[in-house]
Amino acid sequence: MSAGGAGGEAKGGYPPQTIMALGIVGGLVGIYLGNFAPPAYSFFGGLGAICATVWGADAVRRVASYGLGTGVPSIGMLALGMGILAALFGLSVGGTAGPIVAIVVAAIIGGVIGALANKVIGMGIPIMEKAMVEISCAGTLVILGLSVVIAGSFDFASVVQYVVANGYIALIFIIGGMGILHPFNASLGPDEKQDRTLMLAVEKGAIALIIAGFASSLHEGLMAAGLNMLIGIIIWYVAFSKHYALIKRDAYAVVGSGMLPSSEELQ
């Protein structure tokens, strides 16, 4: 991560504690419902992943507002890297309590990395340690939620077989990381608004659910996969429509660019 220009504390209508509660409670409830419900309802894991994505995107927004520069994409990938380690460790030793163990481990990893970033690298961001804890935990919940969508449960053996061994973990890494890093990266600037940024996070989380739903077809069958994708498409459409409305609210003008001029017209 590289430091960008000078920045400051991000402002927004939704307090961090509220969004954190949404991410933790919504994420865990979705993951556990997806685990214990029949495979046709594994989309609950995706709903939990969306809640965690919103939490992670807000944490990125708050820490990146201090001036991360090109570190905005990097911190999103870092979140999922920490998330994979914490999620697999938690599931391997925690059994039914695996997701909770994973969050605790993620918080420890995030705290250590945040302290190194501030104390050793010298980034000097006041909320770095706290933000890295949040981002690490959010990334872990995203990994767990999307794994439940694909595998139908968070049983360690099932996740290893249906998510890790076949390479879908790399897919989750990319789509989950994009959901956390992209919203602020696409919205940053003096006119950035919290609600618009977080609505984009919902949209990206829904796309992740659609893709994970498609991947689940190899294990859960076409009916369950179709339901996963349908839920994702509905959420995506609603979030996209709302995000576009927020863009029009904040933009000075929305105009059509028309066709690109021909070479003759440019002469």
Swiss-Prot record:
| TM annotation in the entry | 19-39, 75-95, 97-117, 140-160, 162-182, 198-218, 221-241
State if Translocase is listed as a keyword. yes
Q: Which domain of life is it from?
A: Archaea
Q: Does the keyword Translocase apply?
A: yes
The UniProt entry's GO CC annotations, sorted and at most eight, read:
plasma membrane
**What EC numbers are recorded for this enzyme?**
7.2.1.4
Q: Could you provide one GO biological process annotation from this protein's UniProt record? A: methanogenesis, from carbon dioxide
Compartments in which it is found: Cell membrane
GO MF annotation terms: tetrahydromethanopterin S-methyltransferase activity
Q: How does it assemble?
A: The complex is composed of 8 subunits; MtrA, MtrB, MtrC, MtrD, MtrE, MtrF, MtrG and MtrH.
Give the function comment from the record: Part of a complex that catalyzes the formation of methyl-coenzyme M and tetrahydromethanopterin from coenzyme M and methyl-tetrahydromethanopterin. This is an energy-conserving, sodium-ion translocating step.
Would you identify the family this protein belongs to, as annotated?
A: Belongs to the MtrC family.
* Name by which UniProt lists this protein: Tetrahydromethanopterin S-methyltransferase subunit C
Which organism does this record belong to? Methanosarcina barkeri (strain Fusaro / DSM 804)
